């Protein structure tokens, strides 16, 4: 699937030169309700959710859009229309669709009984759930393991393998 990464020109050029892209940590994403797409009133779910939140610290997110020509995306992520938009081909099996909801999801099952706790699939679903107000982003995500920090203090992943820069 062809997906697009909006960024400032200086970061785009650095990405191209170094053949890598920055991985965002959950706590650094711009939506203050990120990873809070669920109603935590159920105690067993809340406990499982906390465990999943800890597991989420082992991986990061790279956010892409399916659209390269969205004026709001250029304004918000493309350095106020002065940046660049990089187009990548990424195999569909590595892409996670973001689902948008008008309110927090309420779990209707006992997580422990039905799933044996918070499964990897449930954690991924939580990581790919956003409030409906963000729907204009038409976002997809790639979830990657966090390895060693760059000397700058950030995490990066190479373009090689599952991600090919095309435009």
Where would I find each of the regions flagged by the language model?
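Partner-binding and oligomerization surfaces adjacent to conserved cores of proteins
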Residues: 1-167
